[in-house]
A protein has these predicted regions:
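Short, surface-exposed loop/helix-turn segments at secondary-structure junctions
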Residues: 242, 274-301
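Short glycine/serine-rich loop segments
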Residues: 1-113, 309-329
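Acyltransferase
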Residues: 152-179, 204-215, 240-261
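Short helix-loop capping/hinge segments that flank enzyme active sites or metal/cofactor-binding pockets
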Residues: 135-144, 193-255, 269-280, 318-319, ...
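Short, gly/Ser/Thr-rich active-site loops of penicillin-recognizing serine hydrolases
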Residues: 238, 342-363
Length: 363
């Protein structure tokens, strides 16, 4: 696990760096990278992770396994760290879910995990509805494979575009023009506002005061990633509530899309596994995508934020390999509370285009 579950790589001072099982020079992803590697290497029958900004879906995609971010609120997260030990309130955006070598195992795990905790179980029960359809040819699928706001690595895009054609050849209906009515850039920006606004309460008082002073001193024209991070962390309660209202409108746009389509296919992350980067300042990190540097925790999170912001289920599925031999993952975004539909579509997609493959050298 990365320190405080706060990175899209996995390393910490106690246990060192977690390598990708397909290429030790590459990251396993994060923050639940150890769980994804354990599944990929066959060390475990089932793993759990948590996912706020992709921490299940990113390592699952990088390591060639299945991972599911549940609909927000259906798997209890009481006791999760962060927040600080002893925190009772569930963090906004945070979910806990399974990582497995098959979609069937994800479905089984969700039947066991989903439901209220002891405090809420006195009054309600949860029964997830079955998948919307039975076979691939019955599903109506939307696909959003690339976007200028979060460019996708050419080798990964090439593989995902091939997956779309493989699905069509297998009888699936896939619409590559369908969108939920907002831009990826706007969604990513709103995600960051909600994310850093919700995390502010968990910061030590001194650190928060420094960030608030830094935000107040920023010139109005500074729209850099570091400036946005400071403003979002120091935002007022009113601004945070406005962001939450904007999120509700975003959810309504998704709900309308899912009256016409059963699920949306998109990248779980815009690149396959990338080289280790342990540099301490996240705000100064950049990841090259097609030769152009992208902010490490900015636009790169646009794809995991698609489901994450709006409380939707998102399932990462392995769909073969890039031309460089790295696992390629696709994300299936499903309707709210229809987790079994997202998982079922992931199973059908992987059956056609990939599925789990044991890494070389793993006995």
């Amino acid at each position: 696990l990365s320190t405080q579950a706060m990175d899209i790589q996995t390393y910490n001072a106690a246990f060192g760096t977690t390598n990708n099982p397909w290429d030790a020079t590459k990251t396993a992803g994060g923050s639940s990278g150890g769980s994804a590697v354990a599944m990929s290497a066959g060390l475990s029958a089932l793993e759990a992770g948590s996912d706020l900004g992709g921490s299940i879906r990113i390592p699952s995609s990088f390591c060639g396994v299945f991972g599911h971010r549940p609909s927000f609120g259906i798997v209890p997260t009481r006791g999760h760290v962060p927040g600080p030990p002893g925190t009772l309130a569930a963090p906004d955006l945070e979910t806990a879910g399974p990582i497995a070598r098959s979609a069937d195992d994800l479905d089984l795990a969700m039947r066991l995990l989903a439901g209220p905790d002891d405090a809420h179980g006195v009054a309600w029960r949860l029964v997830l509805p079955p998948p919307r359809r039975k076979g691939l040819s019955e599903y109506r699928l939307a696909a959003w494979i690339d976007d200028p706001a979060a460019p996708v690595d050419a080798a990964l895009r090439e593989r995902l575009e091939a997956v779309i054609e493989e699905l069509r050849a297998a009888g699936a209906e896939v619409d590559t023009e369908a969108r939920p009515g907002f831009t990826l850039a706007d969604n990513a920006r709103l995600f960051m506002r909600v994310l850093y606004g919700s995390m502010a309460a968990g910061l030590p008082e001194g650190q928060f005061e420094k960030i608030r002073a830094r935000a107040a001193a920023l010139p109005p024209e500074d729209d850099s990633f570091r400036a946005r991070l400071a403003r979002d962390t120091a935002q007022t309660h009113r601004d945070f509530d406005l962001a939450r209202e904007a999120r509700e409108r975003r959810r309504a746009q998704w709900a309308e899309l899912f009256t016409r389509y059963d699920a949306l296919l998109c990248p779980a992350f815009p690149t396959p596994a990338f080289p280790h980067d342990p540099s301490p300042d996240f705000a100064r990190r950049a990841l090259a995508v097609n030769g152009e540097p992208q902010p490490y925790l900015g636009t790169l999170l646009g794809w995991p934020a698609l489901s994450g912001l709006s409380s939707l289920p998102g399932t990462a599925a392995p769909v073969g390999f890039t031309r460089d031999g790295l696992p390629a993952g696709i994300q299936v975004v499903g309707p709210f509370l229809e987790d079994r539909t997202a998982i079922h579509v992931a199973k059908l997609v992987a059956d056609v285009s990939g599925g789990y493959v044991r890494p070389p050298g793993v006995d």
